[in-house]
Amino acid sequence: MVETEIGGRLRTSRRKELAVAVVQASPVYPNTTESLRVALAFIEEAAAAGAKLICLGETFLPGYPAWLDYCEGAALWNHPPVKEVFAELRANSIVVPGSETGALSEVAARVHVGIVIGIHERIEDGPGHGSLYNSLLFFREDGSLVNHHRKLIPTYSERMIWANGDAAGLRCAKI
């Protein structure tokens, strides 16, 4: 039991241990299919090692667009090489829900782990149609998607790719 004083009140709580795995690996940029294969393999490996919450990095599916900061002409309007790379990134971005989220949900339920993973999200219809978002998904160990957060304000060169998110995903979820 742990006792803490918060706001003049004494609170007692039971401390639980949680084994967390943080995956430090490279996706297969910008190939979502192969990056998902890599993610699923690491999730299964971490679960077998006893992890109960497995975290993969920002935009792991299909990978972070580091070219933004290194590609000559990345900010030029209507620049053909950049348009080509952006089109490939857009094509490999994920629709939520979709087959990729289905695969993540299935593995979470099968190996009984929580999964936190960053994705490039593509909006196909409705509000935000045509936009890409830097999103974070949290799957509970029963496979349910319990939080879907879009990065509020992409920074610097990220603004050339991602739209501003909203506060809908700023909430806590029980593990």
Language model features by range: what are they?
Residues 17-29, 135, 148-150:
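Active-site-proximal beta-strand elements of phosphoester/diester hydrolases
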Residues 1-11:
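A short, compositionally biased domain-edge/stem linker segment
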Residues 26, 60, 120-121:
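Catalytic metal-binding/acid-base residues of hydrolase active sites
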Residues 9-20, 172-175:
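Beta-strand-turn-beta hairpins that frame and shape the catalytic cleft
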Residues 24-41:
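N-terminal phosphate-binding loop and adjacent alpha-helix
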